[in-house]
Amino acid sequence: MGDVKYYIHTAGASPNQASAEKIIALDLIGSAYALDAFGKVIAKGGAGLLVSSQTGYMWPPLTPEEEMQVMTTPADKLAELPCLKKITNPGIAYIVSKKANYLQVQYAATHCWGQRGARINTISPGVIVTPLAFDEFNAAGEGYQKMIDATPARRVGTPDEIGAAGAFLLSDAASYITGTDLLVDGGTIAALKNGKFKLTGLDD
């Protein structure tokens, strides 16, 4: 394949598309394998972008010890971590997977990607008008509408807005940005942290 200049990772399944086990396998472990694989062929000066989600900022947080485990455990050993094996709720699996994406990118930025002179970041979209979002709306539309109404933007985002933010992170204008996340959510997480709305359906 040769050296790769740019890499964008978009694979993932939502809580209404897959079981907790499958979400962790695809969104968390699959992302780890991809970061490792492309970290071996990314060109010097290259850049990568992993599309995550605003849910990585939501409940439940991993403990500091669990965060370190997820960040540093090799991809082929992640499925054995107790903090992941115990998850049975697809919503929690999705939240933890998206938190893990950012942790794994932090590690990659300072190890294989950084050692090759390349950058890697995540972008965390809020509610964006995509087929995946429609699946979630159909399953829990009222809850999503309450969340949208509570945010400062009071609307959903568009693919073009995420594309523009992603293009910036991959561009030379972002050459000093690596190992971090760009939250593009219309203020959803700010509203959540300030008590404007509460998450539901994450009791187990």
Annotate each PLM feature:
Residues 72-84, 137-151, 201-203:
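A short C-terminal helix-loop "cap" of Rossmann-like NAD(P)-dependent dehydrogenase/epimerase domains
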Residues 13-17, 40, 44-116, 125-129:
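Catalytic loop of short-chain dehydrogenase/reductase
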Residues 178-204:
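Short C-terminal tail/terminal secondary-structure segment
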Residues 33, 93-94, 99-102, 122, ...:
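C-terminal helical subdomain
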Residues 114, 119, 177-179:
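Short, small/polar-rich loop/turn modules that mediate ligand/substrate recognition or access, typified
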Residues 23-24:
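A hydrophobic alpha-helix adjacent to the NAD(P)-binding/active-site core of NAD(P)-dependent oxidoreductases
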Residues 7-8:
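Conserved hydrophobic beta-strands of the Rossmann-like cofactor-binding core
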